[in-house]
UniProtKB/Swiss-Prot annotation:
It is found in: Secreted. This is Agouti-signaling protein. One of its GO terms (cellular component) is extracellular space. Involved in the regulation of melanogenesis. The binding of ASP to MC1R precludes alpha-MSH initiated signaling and thus blocks production of cAMP, leading to a down-regulation of eumelanogenesis (brown/black pigment) and thus increasing synthesis of pheomelanin (yellow/red pigment).
Amino acid sequence: MDVTRLLLATLLVFLCFFTANSHLPPEEKLRDDRSLRSNSSVNLLDFPSVSIVALNKKSKQIGRKEAEKKRSSKKEASMKKVARPRTPLSAPCVATRNSCKPPAPACCDPCASCQCRFFRSACSCRVLSLNC
């Protein structure tokens, strides 16, 4: 019994190793820079060189000022969007996106209608026409 379990465990490990290695791409082993240059499809000299330039204090301050302006404009835009007070809903109606099973009253929004799905098990008030 223990021998069969050992064989099955070994087989399982072998299969896991085999499937992991079968999905990996084959590796190309390059021995020196000459073979790298001859085997590469992209010539490294085609790309422009990158130059790193140190920033002076003035350019750093301008960058900070621009970032602060962007932050303040975002804050002002979020403050300007104040939620308008909702009109109080009258009792004998159902709000939009709420459940409106057939014994329930009609939808409060005049453009909304009660739409049922799954054999009238899930019903909700939905606005169907945007031009209303």
